[in-house]
Amino acid sequence: MNKDEAGGNWKQFKGKVKEQWGKLTDDDMTIIEGKRDQLVGKIQERYGYQKDQAEKEVVDWETRNEYRW
């Protein structure tokens, strides 16, 4: 599986992403569609985080959920 593409796993984890980052809209989720870089970017945009802070949140989320892109 490509590092930036979650493929089928994305459908399983979409709800967990929305739980973690409730400010993400359904349109955001469509844009993200399993692409890690898009998730980091949308977290930056919606929460006003710097890239490193958004990246850290995603890494923490991946670890907690045993999610691999």
Curated annotation (Swiss-Prot):
Cellular component aspect of the GO annotation: cell pole; cytosol
One Pfam family recorded for the sequence: CsbD
Organism domain of life: Bacteria
Protein family membership: Belongs to the UPF0337 (CsbD) family.
Official protein name in the record: UPF0337 protein YjbJ
Species of provenance: Escherichia coli (strain K12)
